[in-house]
Amino acid sequence: AWSADGGETWTGWRIVDILPDGPQDRSYGCFAGLVRLPIAGRDILLYSNCDSPAGRKRGTVWVSFDGGKTWPLKRLVWKDPFQYSSLSAGRPGTASEGWIYMHFEGRLPQTRVARFNLSWLMDGEPTGDGAVPKIGSR
């Protein structure tokens, strides 16, 4: 989707059924995280949210290798209570380069930060929504 007015209106949007927005039995979302990885020549997006029909738990990251058209891979990051996540990618040329950070609420009042990389995500579970490309030495 694209917005030319700061998010007031959107064009080209669509619902992506493979990506949950919070508990699947509710009509409200759970503030998912989304980030584009700063990798030259690639359009890799990551999405984080809970992946459980039984409520706010199973914090999972989904991976898209084609700018969000498909989401062929996911990996569980946190199995316990999980909500309100945000994602950020390390900056090139700094000590954080190559790292992905996920900040989220666990069991209240706890907040947590998970740190992982794309290689770790590549060992995730196929979703059936598109193909997983070979990255690096894979």
Language-model segments: residues:
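Asp-box/BNR beta-propeller blade signature and adjacent active/binding-site loops
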Residues: 1-138
